[in-house]
Curated annotation (Swiss-Prot):
Designated name of the protein: Nuclear transcription factor Y subunit nfya-2
Family of this protein: Belongs to the NFYA/HAP2 subunit family.
GO cellular component, one term: nucleus
UniProt tissue specificity: Highly expressed in certain parts of the gonads. Expressed in the spermatheca, intestine and in some neurons in the head. Not expressed in the intestine, the hypodermis, body wall muscle surrounding the pseudocoelomic space, secretory cells in the pharyngeal terminal bulb wall, in the small ganglia surrounding the pharynx and in the neurons running anteriorly to the sensory organs in the head.
Composition skew (Basic and acidic residues), residue ranges: 166-188
Keyword RNA-binding annotated: no
Molecular function GO labels: DNA binding; DNA-binding transcription factor activity, RNA polymerase II-specific; DNA-binding transcription repressor activity
Length: 281
């Protein structure tokens, strides 16, 4: 009631329409290359659903304007947000679909221009990933030392024959695959056996002493020998043999020994000394 008692001068009430609330967070997500966010924003109003064309126009208007816009959907409908990248910019399309719609249904509802841009972007991503993987494998893998060694054909035949013979001996059991003793181990055992009176080698005495004095190490089971890995060989390849080069030989030059030259000079000088000059008429 107005304190002055004048009902005509009461203040007028102004009601402001609040902005609609932001859409709820996605409850379902499609697992694909692009982002499919499902918005189950079923309207609680009893108003009949708008026609498809009008609904799609409202969705496009909601994308263009920055202010929030309310979209009424039937209870058995959901709003799908499809986001993709085009020319470095993020683009979004809202499509009303039924609750039992699949990813293929959403793709079929997209415009043809959108599908072409998405396929082009996915192809660029695949090419970039392939180049990155190739670069990673090329530069991150350790450098292999198994490069073929160039040998001459005669060495190649000899090496291949020796490898085949060794492989046959390993398969037949003539070459054991157990680790052989190192040189320092065998020398130590030999030195222990020579520690007897007079420094003589006595293997039987050491074996008897070892059997008479049992130790913890002898009672314990001996560890199994580490098996030797199969023999691995380096890669070899015969070098291409070049044809022999025919170099023209120089004509052979004959050289007379020095003694023969001296004898010939002496013979000539003696003949000149004993020659009788002709009489001059």
């Amino acid at each position: 009631m107005n304190p002055r008692g004048n009902p005509s001068k009461m203040p007028t009430q102004i009601v402001l329409n609040r902005r609609p609330a932001a859409p709820a967070r996605p409850q379902t997500t499609f697992t694909s290359l692009s982002q499919y966010h499902m918005y189950n924003t079923a309207s609680t109003s009893s108003a009949p659903p708008p026609p498809p064309n009008q609904n799609f126009g409202q969705i496009r208007e909601a994308i263009r304007t920055t202010q929030p816009t309310t979209v009424q959907l039937p209870p058995d409908c959901k709003l799908v947000e499809y986001t993709w990248q085009e020319n470095g910019e993020s683009r979004t399309v809202l499509i009303p679909m039924s609750n039992d719609s699949t990813e293929d249904d959403v793709r079929s509802a997209l415009p043809q221009s959108v599908l072409e841009s998405i396929n082009q972007h996915q192809n660029q991503l695949r090419q970039g990933n392939a180049q990155a993987v190739h670069y990673y494998q090329k530069h991150q893998n350790p450098i292999s030392h198994e490069k073929p060694i160039m040998v001459n054909p005669r060495q190649y035949k000899r090496i291949i024959k020796r490898r085949e013979m060794r492989q046959k001996m390993e398969d037949s059991g003539r070459l054991p695959l157990e680790r052989q003793k190192y040189m320092h181990e065998s020398r130590r055992q030999h030195a222990l056996k020579r520690r007897r009176t007079g420094g003589r080698f006595d293997a039987n005495a050491e074996a008897a002493a070892a059997s008479s004095e049992p130790s913890i190490s002898s009672a314990a089971p001996s560890p199994p020998k580490a098996p030797r890995a199969p023999t691995t060989y380096a890669m070899i390849r015969p070098a291409t043999s070049h044809p022999p080069v025919n170099i023209p030989k120089a004509p052979a030059m004959t050289y007379r020994p020095v003694q023969e030259e001296k004898k010939s000079i002496e013979r000539i000088s003696k003949a000149q000394m004993f020659t009788i000059p002709k009489r001059q008429q």
